[in-house]
Amino acid sequence: MGEKGIRVEFAGAGRPPRMFRPGEFPRPLSPREAETLRFMLSPQDPRLDSLREQAEVAHVRGVCHCGCATIDLAVDRDRASQASALSSPVIETRTPQFDPANGPFELILHLADGWLKELEIVYYANDPPPEFP
């Protein structure tokens, strides 16, 4: 834990470290977080089967310090299998049209060594979105 209980993790090649707000963790995914994760894993590609399995036993380890909906994930590795032949980010999506009130946003699903790692929202508005759209 860093200053004021904020956890910092190195994000990997080319990405700055992400800082997570302190809180009651681990915790289950909220209904909206679980729905968003299912949406991100909905393409009918058999390579995603192990990630869908992981999503069923994933929990939240932290949330982004900026107040956005980004969540740091952990998976019960005894109850799911590791994905292979996939790199991170594994899934990305963007808003199809510009929303003047909220601006555009992107959702990105990251892996670490074949395990679900982070469900990230990238936003371009002034205020961070506190939940996934």
What do these predicted ranges mean?
Residues 98-133:
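Short, compact, well-ordered microdomains
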